[in-house]
Amino acid sequence: MTAEQAWPWPQTMDALQAAPASHRLLIENDRVRVLDVVIEPGASEPEHTHQAPSVMMVDEPARIRYYQAGMLLFEAPARPEQSPGVRIRWMEPEGPHYVENIDQRRYHAIRIELK
């Protein structure tokens, strides 16, 4: 989505409003918004959005399912018992989606959204 395109979803779908149990604000200023993302074993987030591009740093991976428009788009493979290191990836803005943790361990990430 480009800057010229309007964000089509309401602010109420923002992760902090729509999925507060799994998204906690760590810091926000005029340049970034940093979220602590935790999805407990067996939990499913409510549907939500992320309007800004971001860097996602996963330090506690788990087996998850990623859904968009009610359809399963991705299922993470089983992880080794010990997953060394932090996984870092670029994320474009995300429309309505939710994540289900199907693992026996929690999922944890820090998401740095760029303004």
Task: Name each model-derived stretch.
Residues 71-93:
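Short acidic-glycine-tyrosine-enriched beta hairpin
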Residues 3, 39-40, 46-47, 99-104:
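Hydrophobic alpha-helical transmembrane segments of multi-pass integral membrane proteins
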Residues 1-19:
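N-terminal low-complexity, Pro/Thr/Ser-rich intrinsically disordered segments
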